[in-house]
């Protein structure tokens, strides 16, 4: 008997959609190319003692009554899957030469802190922060208006969204006349987008910046527990996930997708899976290439013409015999830059592959929870994240493996040098474990084209009302992916839940 929903891929949006449908007594089958579920949200084990999440660090939308919380409540998971909040008085600590700023959820306090740093620009700072707050409120109104929007019935505040539809963050910084240093402090969480201010959609920045202002969180029992809990809902409701199954083709009869051809990565055999509905969690462009773009409508073909987001460089580390609290670490992230010009810094790292003065994020999740520690007792996880060019690393790996390894070591050493100079003297003496991941690592383990981290690039061109959504123009097939919804933890939860609402008529967010 065919399942009601055959889902291709087990990324976070697919698991949310699958869990909601399974809970609604629909038969759900998921085929996954990897050996673990979760996509970028999966947790990997290295050796006997170390566990790291591939890409997730801190998340938003998890507070009482917020979107993730409402979805978990609908699944009866809100008491099982809980979250610890980062310090609301300063969940992101921004560091640059001569300045530091603790980002707070209180906009008035944020205005005060910035004004103390830049007293001559108090008026401009206030106007900018209040405008960000207003646009955030407009997004809430826009979302509450539902799926079928009537622009003439939207609250007046929501119409303010359209003013900045084509703007980058840099455009709006310039409109409000913020000093360069203030711009850098406010945009220093750029690794959350892997874009600098002069390319990043202002709307994308507002959604994430204010999302974290409303509460930055880390799962009490780590991200692995979140993924496993969603899987458990699916399996307890007669659903299943079949691993090591790579989708290689879609069978289309006229305008209807009837089945998916997969390659079993264990035995090398091809199999055919069918379902009453096909949910495509894999990259939409990749799926369209398999189907044949000529079979899709002109409108969908146009929406599929997106660039991928940049990729990243990750260093997963553990330290011992040190109290990180004494060195300024705690229930917050640290974002560092050695230059006040993030646009130029990004260009230098991403296009010139020069990491001599990098900007990067430092995450210490161990301060948020002591539950089921993922490292040996007495050690602390510390992770470093920055941007990296997929084409550059792919070419290095294919042509000169030693040069590829040397470049990864060079980037890590550059970041550690900065950590020792600015934050933790003798950091290397306390380093108990380290492993790095490059864009090709992302591609190999998460099956993401060009090692992309967020699906389509988060520029104004892609963050607009013409953005790709669940529609494929084919019968019985729907997209459910970061590129057809939104990226990140809260974004993919939202994407899966929105598709569930569309197909079930059961509104939960």
Task: Indicate where each model-derived feature is located.
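Helical element adjacent to the flavin cofactor pocket in flavoenzyme catalytic cores
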Residues: 206-269
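Rossmann-like flavin
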Residues: 97-200
